[in-house]
């Protein structure tokens, strides 16, 4: 679950989480749990790692989704949020994709996708701090993901500074 992942990485990080205004952002991010509970979270078989590199086109034109090691029961909107973030879809591209994807059998919640995008950006920003404490160098990856989450939070009513 994403909120547990956030707390897990926070506990693994030895130093300070030095992202700007982190405590206020954290509070706003954790409050998204209430929004998700109101909307409802579906549990279906999901891939969990929908990055472009996991889509392979065979010579015959068939498309294969590989690397199922992280698959689990999760909300399908999590996978769509990951696909949109990791593939850098524009809003128009997201709308186009969803026009093909959505049906009676596969309803879409754009609000859940928005929330899951924020959560994924926060998780990956914390993951980056943890990895960099252990010698990795990801450049501006972590702060870029953090800033994108903050921007999305601000566009939806801001960040509670209290």
Indicate where each model-derived feature is located.
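An alpha-helical support segment within catalytic cores of ATP-dependent transferases
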Residues: 1-48, 59-60
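A glycine-centered beta->alpha junction motif in the catalytic cores
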Residues: 6-19, 122-139
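ATP/Mg2+ or Mg2+-diphosphate-binding catalytic cores
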Residues: 27, 127-162
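Pre-DFG segment of protein kinase catalytic domains
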Residues: 45, 64-67
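Active-site activation/catalytic loop segments of kinase-like enzymes and analogous catalytic loops
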Residues: 77-105, 118-136, 148
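Start-of-helix signal in alpha-solenoid helical-repeat scaffolds, especially tetratricopeptide repeats
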Residues: 111, 115-119
């Amino acid at each position: 679950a994403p909120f547990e992942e956030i707390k897990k990485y926070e506990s693994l990080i030895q130093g300070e989480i030095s992202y700007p205004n982190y405590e206020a952002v954290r509070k706003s991010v954790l409050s998204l749990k209430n929004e998700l509970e109101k909307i409802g979270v579906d549990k279906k078989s999901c891939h969990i790692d929908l990055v472009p590199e996991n889509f392979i086109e065979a010579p015959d034109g068939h498309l294969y989704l590989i690397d199922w090691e992280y698959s689990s029961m999760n909300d399908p909107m999590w996978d769509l949020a990951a696909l949109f973030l990791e593939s850098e879809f524009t809003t128009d591209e997201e709308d186009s994709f969803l026009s093909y994807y959505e049906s009676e059998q596969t309803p879409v919640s754009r609000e859940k996708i928005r929330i899951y995008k924020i959560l994924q950006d926060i998780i990956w920003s914390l993951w980056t701090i943890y990895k960099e404490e252990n010698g990795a160098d990801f450049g501006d990856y972590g702060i870029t993901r953090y800033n994108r989450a903050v921007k999305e939070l601000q566009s939806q009513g801001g960040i509670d500074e209290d």
